[in-house]
From Swiss-Prot:
Catalyzes the phospholipid dependent N-acylation of the N-terminal cysteine of apolipoprotein, the last step in lipoprotein maturation. Can transfer a number of fatty acids (C16 and C19, palmitic and probably tuberculostearic acids respectively are shown). Enhances the polyprenol monophosphomannose (PPM) synthase activity of Ppm1 (AC A0QZ12) without itself having PPM synthase catalytic activity. The gene is lnt. The keyword Endoplasmic reticulum does not apply. The keyword Cytoplasm does not apply. Its main location: membrane. This is Apolipoprotein N-acyltransferase. It is found in: Cell membrane. GO terms for biological process: lipoprotein biosynthetic process. It comes from Mycolicibacterium smegmatis (strain ATCC 700084 / mc(2)155) (Mycobacterium smegmatis). Residues 1-29 have a biased composition (Acidic residues).
Length: 594
């Protein structure tokens, strides 16, 4: 057990080495002297030199004292980044969070310091994670987004310093981590879940936990293991240094040991179910599906020509698939999935685009899910609102059911507060006028209910879950990554892997430029394309109907973790005296000693 704070604990000196240099060295009051005395005074230059030397010494000491935590915060953020694609060293997330935990549990770390170290950790994580944004809009929006997301890491750091005095702080740190990820996935403008720690685990064993609790439970396990490593390491190091002294208790390793063991045990219990689902065993119906990656022209074409060239490329690649089917080189697909924006020319209004798509559908003799841009209700030349849609295009009847994207991307597909932001940046005019659609998230092609999560939608937990609850037996992720780079596409593919395990469904990712893939319910890639080349995938999958615990109760799991984090934060605030000055509070023996 970790000892709690008692009333017998000595008060901590508030003026420790976390105080800014030079704030606690006021000059003493001069002693009274006779006015006839003629004391020898040092020269003015000497006094100034001494003053500068003292303050310089304190400043230097302060910098040296902070080198270790600053380096640890930066190193921790970089380690968490390494766990994400395209590098994908999933195991580095644990030492990354352990380093952050060490910084936040130092006795010298104040609440303001916790916020600052958290922001620094976040910057070291998000800046290298999101550089693909700069390819379209430049460095300023990329760095601004990285900083905005880092603020949530800062809020976590602030909360962590508040709760560190409570017994069992690694557990409370983990709940606060999940709460911070929920907050950044919700606010502002609908949130930005990109960078949730769960998505760095799609190549690791903890991915299995997505089946029972979704992305939040995976993030919780990552954080719990990481922060438990902080306490475990600190206790062992402290005991190594002081254990030879009489009366020194053994290190308190029970809590971190149990936390790590429990996480691994639950993972081991769930993995066999996940693995069995991915092998294709059972009575599930087997069907063949295809995904077409038509690719886009390189830079140099005028915008309208680019749109037409993209459509032509996808028609051409579908015709190649049809030829291979006739020649016996590929299996006949039941339906074909095209990427998002494969027809940016409105096929419901443009007869030529419609004819081209019909030609492709007739050639392959299967319905095609076409990613298109169509006019939305209320369209006017001054307000050119549109829907980002997926249309089921039948070989004989043409357009049928459609899914209008329900979660549209701020600052890309639409511009929040357009009247305000257009005065701040020339990039504002690049944002679209897309409006969210409505529906169940499911379309039917060849009698198969297909859940659609278009590009941006796949990173939000609710999108795929709604589709599966509404009967989807397979999930499709039409995506357009042509304006970004391969790193972004690799990161998005990780979201598809987690959704496959979370909902026990095959996931078919179709990208204009890649990476397209067919993902099994255990998260492994059955097939995939290379980046920036025309290609198609033609694979057999199984239609799944069972609902996982995460599908049924995932939001409840997240709510419990978030509420626990908020509740323990409130308890800690009351326990600490409502953010009273540090000289009036005591720190727990469980904090990491410097």
């Amino acid at each position: 057990m970790i000892p709690a704070v008692t009333d017998d604990d000595p008060l901590e000196d508030p003026l420790d080495d976390d105080v800014a240099p030079g704030l606690d060295d006021a000059e003493p009051e001069p002693e009274p002297r006779d006015e006839h005395d003629e004391p020898s005074r040092p020269a003015t230059g000497s006094r100034i030199g001494g003053w500068v030397a003292r303050r310089g010494s304190r400043f230097g000491k302060g910098v040296l004292d902070r080198c270790a935590p600053l380096s640890a915060a930066i190193g921790g953020g970089l380690a968490l980044w390494l766990s994400f694609p395209p590098i994908g060293w999933w195991f580095t997330a644990f030492p990354g969070l352990a380093l952050l935990g060490w910084v936040l549990t130092r006795t010298a770390t104040t609440k303001a310091g916790g916020f600052g170290y958290g922001v620094l950790f976040g910057l070291a994580f998000y800046v290298p994670l999101l550089p693909w944004i700069s390819g379209l809009v430049g460095a300023v929006p990329w760095l601004a987004l990285a900083f905005a997301e880092s603020l949530f890491c800062g809020l976590f750091g602030l909360g962590a310093v508040v709760v560190v005095r409570l017994p069992g702080w690694p557990l409370w740190f983990a709940t606060l981590w999940v709460a911070a990820e929920w907050a950044k996935s919700t606010f502002p403008f609908g949130g930005f879940p990109w960078g949730a720690s769960s998505y760095g685990q799609t190549n690791g064993p903890l991915l299995a936990l997505a089946r029972i609790g979704g992305a939040p439970l995976v993030s919780f396990a990552v954080a719990l293991i990481g922060f438990s490593l902080t306490l475990l390491t600190a206790q062992i190091v402290w005991w190594w240094r002081h254990g030879h002294k009489p009366g020194v208790p053994a290190p308190a390793v029970m809590l971190p040991g149990v936390a790590i063991a429990a996480s691994l045990l639950v993972t081991a219990l769930v993995w066999p179910q996940v693995r069995q689902s991915g092998t294709g065993a059972g009575d599930d119906t087997a069907v063949t599906v295809a995904a077409v990656q038509g690719n886009v022209p390189r830079l140099g074409l005028e915008f309208n020509a680019q749109r037409r060239a993209v459509l032509d490329n996808h028609v051409k690649e579908t015709l190649r698939l049809a030829d291979d089917v006739k020649a016996g080189r590929a299996a006949q697909p039941m339906f074909v999935i095209w990427p998002e924006n494969s027809s940016d020319i409105d096929p419901l209004l443009n007869a030529d685009a419609s004819a081209q798509i019909t030609t492709a559908a007739e050639a392959i003799d299967a319905p095609i899910l076409v990613g298109g841009v169509v006019r939305a209700d209320g369209y006017t030349p001054d307000n050119p609102v549109a829907n980002n849609t997926v249309i089921v295009w039948e070989p004989t009847d043409g357009p049928g059911e459609r899914h209008d994207k329900q979660i549209v991307q701020p600052f890309g597909e639409y511009l929040p507060w357009r009247g305000f932001f257009k005065h701040l940046s020339s990039y504002a005019d690049r944002a679209g006028y897309f409006v969210p659609g409505t529906g169940t998230g499911v379309v039917h092609a060849a009698g198969v209910p297909i859940g659609i999560t278009t590009c941006w939608e796949v990173i939000f937990d609710r999108a795929a879950r709604e589709s599966v609850l509404n009967g989807a037996q397979v999930l499709a992720v039409p995506s357009n990554n042509a304006t970004f780079d391969e790193a972004m596409s690799a990161q998005q593919l990780a979201f598809g892997k987690l959704r496959a395990v979370e909902h026990d469904r095959y996931v078919v990712v179709a990208g204009t430029t890649g990476i397209s893939a067919v993902i099994a319910p255990d998260g492994h890639e059955i097939s995939r394309t290379e980046w920036f080349q025309p290609a198609y995938l033609d694979n057999q999958i199984r239609l799944k109907t069972d609902l996982t615990p995460a599908t049924k109760w995932g939001p409840i799991v997240q709510a419990v973790l978030v509420i626990a984090g908020v509740a323990v934060l409130l308890i800690a605030i009351l326990h600490n005296g409502r953010f009273a000055p540090r000289m009036l509070r005591r720190r727990s023996a469980t904090t990491v000693k410097r």
